[in-house]
Amino acid sequence: MNWINKVTPPGLKTMMSKKDTPDDLWVKCPASGELIYRNDLEQSWYVTPAGAHLRISPRMRFRILFDDERWEPISLPQVPLDPLKFKDDKPYPARLKAAKAKILNRDIKETEDGGAPLLQEDCMVAAYGKIGGVPAVVLVQDFEFMGGSLGMAAGEAFITAAQLALARKSAFVVCTASGGARMQEGTLSLMQMPRTTLAINDLADAKLPYVVVLTDPTSGGVSASYAMLGDVHIAEPGAMIAFSGPRVIEQTIRESLPKGFQRSEFLREKGQVDIVVDRRKLKATVARVLGHLLPMSRRRDDRSTLQLTPPKTHAPKPPEPKVKPD
């Protein structure tokens, strides 16, 4: 036995054995390799000093976008969990259960200082609030939940959020992050591509703005549908936006791709993305865009507080005096 153990009181042994330091206290920057204190990252919305934009949770997206960090959660419909009875090395319901547990643990950590849990059931989370005073429905895709894959639950969430934007005459903002369609749902997942497109058409018919914030990564069936159908496309720096990944393309064509291929800056140069915006300036940019696309007179939620200037009226001219003929 070590001599230190002989002289150390039992209570002190217990204190020394406890692991008080969290495992995720430090985060490595993918761009520079620098270790960054997590609290410092939270202050900068998870943008590293080297400019790398790390993936963030739906709750943090809402905090970034909504005025005063206040929003109204939107209840999303339930869908059949395993219509195809799909199974690979583990059953699909088991994968869903593990993904929900992972997200729940993250949500508990994020609400330690207060706040209600999001009660997230799949990769989509929706909320209603104001961005720069403009009423908006915001739908966030969570890559941590099975790679943000598009399935029936995500499709129903998108349609529900779009219909709420229609009902409230508000803007619709979607933050995408996905590896594509969910293979465990087969053709049922591919069906969500045209279904979400029809929901976007309804917004266009109502002349309501649909703004897409492309985050890393946005790929597969998501990039081939609602991610690239916005009125305005805003992308975060360095985000991969593609249908197939660069490695798959290189193996297919047996050629090297240009530097930065399929990154947001490359797509902006080619005209597929309107603007690339640092996350710390995202809210101001989205608010400015919505302010142009959704005129004040059409914001239903603000009509009771609008200071409308009454139309100018002209007083009727007094009748000309009748002149008696001489």
From Swiss-Prot:
Q: Could you confirm whether the keyword Chaperone appears in this record?
A: no
Tell me the InterPro entries matching this sequence: AcCoA_carboxyl_beta, Acetyl_CoA_COase_Trfase_b_su, ClpP/crotonase-like_dom_sf, COA_CT_N
- The enzyme's main class, written as a single word, is transferase
Q: What biological processes does GO assign it? A: fatty acid biosynthetic process; malonyl-CoA biosynthetic process
PROSITE patterns reported in the protein's UniProt record: COA_CT_NTER
Sorted keywords for this record are: ATP-binding, Cytoplasm, Fatty acid biosynthesis, Fatty acid metabolism, Lipid biosynthesis, Lipid metabolism, Nucleotide-binding, Transferase
Q: Where is the composition biased (Basic and acidic residues)?
A: 317-326
**EC number(s) stated in the UniProt entry for this protein:** 2.1.3.15
Region: Disordered; residue ranges are 298-326
Query: Which family, according to the similarity comment?
Result: Belongs to the AccD/PCCB family.
Name of the protein described by the UniProt record: Acetyl-coenzyme A carboxylase carboxyl transferase subunit beta
Question: Which species is the source of this protein?
Answer: Hyphomonas neptunium (strain ATCC 15444)
> Could you tell me the gene encoding this protein?
accD
